[in-house]
Amino acid sequence: MGSSVSKNISKVATEALARASSDILLQTDLTTDQTQVISVSDVGGDVVISGNEFIQKATINMKALMNALIQENVQQNLTLQIAQAAKSIVSGFNMFQLPNAQNEIDLFVRASIELVNTISQVCTSSVSENYLIDIKRVKGSVRIQNNTVRQFVDIFGSCVQNAVASNAIFQDLQAKLDQSATSKADGLTLWQVAALVAIVLGVPVVSVIGGIAVAGRWMFPISILAGAGCLVVWSSQANTTMADHAFSRFVRNTSDCLGTALGPVLQTLPNSNAAAQSCLSNADCVAFDWQGTVVDDKGTNKVLTPPQTTFYNKVSSICEQAVKSNPDTTRLVRLPIFAKGVGSPQSKASPPADVYLDTATTNYYFFDPPTNMWVKQGTFAHAEWSAAKNQIDWGTITPTVSTPGTPGNIYVYYGSDNPIYFYVYVKTADSWSLYTPTLRGPGLVTDTPATINVSGFKVNQRRQWLLYLGVALIIVGIFGSILAFNSRRPEERK
């Protein structure tokens, strides 16, 4: 499987960042001001995003672009895009071969979302201050090309890969998947195959090199026959396993599948693993749908009791890929729950929240699911704040001049759609002043459902070491036979 986790999430994050950057350009007026997000030289007339006559270079101010990329609405779109794409990645990894698959999925999605929050910091320090991109132009009009997305992929690709490579969660998941795949592998490793070939062919090869072709006359043809035998065994014997794909829309709902049901719908299998084992033990079963939840168009899940399983004895050759590449609408993120109280939080259940404010100290905490603990993030207090005379509160409404409060009081504003930042306001004599810097908020939090719909497909896994060994034996046998023939004396060739 190699580095498929890192490669897939890098590709998704880079493309999402590139699309967002391109969208920002499409909504930005082009000017000659080099401090703007995008600027062009020699602009005649009004500048609008239209026309497509000839190509001109435009300068991208990366600092201005990064500032635009960290706005709440852009960050929310990036988060939702990556969370949606993460479902396809998860589905392709056959995650249900791992114990605690739900936790692994949740960790993966969480790391993917956090990647959005860190990319801007990583890329800001690693990309150049300015970049030139191609645009198309008609007289005084300028049109941003479709290939700006591709150009931004080139710009952001390296720094996104670095951000992914340094993320321990992605690397840990990859190690678990690799370990699981290795533990199920049947046969020799490639190094063992190489050693076996060396042992089998070592003597005749040495004999040819030494000028003695007698052994080679027999051993190399035998090598060809042995290689052919390995290929026959490789093609005729296979280990049958199940490939499970999460967040499925089901075989029955995928037009490309053309599935034929194998008997009635069952309501006796409690989970997808049981369905997979049942299909695996049935020679007529080639695929299954296991439904444990009903997912509506908004991505809300409602548990289906009892779960339903449908087995199939026939599906199309493209069915598995069609199901894997088109996951359902399950939402994997949600708005966090905010709570406040006097004193530090004690547990997840007390209070039942994701973010907590201690009104006695202005300390704020995020709940960390992997450790099941509250983690202090910082404090909102300014130097003059005192618990004895001042108060603190938070919410989704920006304070105004008419908002009541005692001088020194604190109000923390966070976005109602995506609380990715905390804006700290302090009451003065006649207004509320915004303090800097802006603090990092929780953003959207992961919400992987406990029950996930799954489709599984029977897969025949062949012993690849037999293929490697067979090909190696045939190649060495052919070349060895030629070598042995050429080493014979002229009178022996007749």
Curated annotation (Swiss-Prot):
It is a multi-pass membrane protein. One of its GO terms (cellular component) is membrane. It comes from the Viruses. A lipid is attached at G2 (N-myristoyl glycine). Keywords: Lipoprotein, Membrane, Myristate, Transmembrane, Transmembrane helix. The chain crosses the membrane at residues 193-213, 214-234, 465-485. This is Putative myristoylated protein 006R. It comes from Invertebrate iridescent virus 3 (IIV-3).
